[in-house]
């Protein structure tokens, strides 16, 4: 609806997570915390139009928004995709109960679309969310990390594979870190992420 107003995040941005920054190489969060993933980026800043857009996509089933998001990921992350050379695209899973409630897994929908555009293998079931956790929205960074301990389980062979994790929004990185840790414990190579949006802080 407001596609023309949207601008992807340009430079300077954090070398690790891709958050917009004013100077330097890393955002404050990546200076303070050692993340489990290698690198990643979000395409748009999570505010205003995009916050409303993602809410409609996630909670009201507006899948046409997902089509636009996946096209934007493919269009604006060409350089990263070439550099990262992922072998497999994997979405952040949601617990069964949440998927029933929403009617779909919004990250899995994005992953499948991106896989179609890129030709990269996609597996939406290889990581499962086995614990029903509290919503991350109202938790601080430490609580988010604790909340996700042992939440994910890898059900297939990821040994030696470079993995691209897909989600809708990156805030503190705790979800991506939990996913990356789980994948690496099962022998995955490098883990990267792409999200539709990323917070400023």
Name each region found by the language model.
Residues 1-167, 171-201:
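Glycine-rich phosphate/pyrophosphate-handling loop used in enzymes and phosphotransfer proteins
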């Amino acid at each position: 609806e407001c596609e023309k107003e949207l601008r992807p995040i340009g430079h300077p941005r954090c070398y690790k997570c891709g958050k917009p920054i004013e100077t330097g190489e890393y955002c404050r969060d990546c200076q303070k915390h050692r993340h489990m993933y290698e690198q990643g980026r979000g395409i748009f800043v999570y505010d205003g139009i995009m916050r409303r857009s993602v809410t409609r996509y996630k909670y009201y089933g507006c899948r046409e928004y997902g089509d636009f998001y996946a096209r934007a990921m493919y269009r604006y992350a060409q350089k990263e995709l070439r550099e990262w050379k992922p072998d497999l695209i994997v979405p952040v899973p949601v617990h069964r109960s949440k998927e029933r409630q929403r009617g779909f897994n919004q990250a899995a929908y994005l992953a499948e679309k991106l896989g179609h555009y890129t030709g990269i293998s996609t597996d939406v079931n290889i990581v499962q969310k086995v614990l029903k956790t509290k919503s991350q929205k109202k938790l601080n960074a430490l609580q988010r990390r604790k909340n996700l301990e042992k939440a994910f389980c890898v059900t297939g062979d990821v040994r030696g594979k470079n993995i691209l994790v897909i989600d809708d929004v990156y805030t503190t990185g705790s979800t991506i870190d939990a996913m990356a840790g789980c994948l690496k414990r099962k022998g995955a190579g490098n883990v990267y992420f792409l999200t539709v949006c990323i917070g400023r802080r």
